[in-house]
Amino acid sequence: MDAIGPLQLRVMHYIWKNGASTVHAVHDALNAEPGAPKLAYTTILTVMRNLAKRGILNQRPAGRSHIFEPLVDERTYKLSILRQVREDLFGGDLNRLLGLLSEDADLSQRERDALGQASA
């Protein structure tokens, strides 16, 4: 599975958290996020339809609107992306990936220790 873009990911985070949703509900929720740019209803509609075309969401009619529900759960998506990063950037070598992560200056000592234990 290919990675999805930032706006698609915001939509998916909402749906993973709240379950099956209408475009209207997602539009309202994303526009209510503090500091986030305001998005047109048609933008959210297009994003959700594109996610449905990619097999990430299911779209079904419900009266005059449509309900979109996840076909891919959050854990499955994250694992797929992590596997892709491991293969594409580290030749499948998990220790190289963990080694680079441990060099991240933003990590706390506790997080570094956890990475060290994971790679041991």
Q: Each PLM stretch: what is its role?
A:
Residues 80-120:
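Amphipathic alpha-helical dimerization/coiled-coil segments
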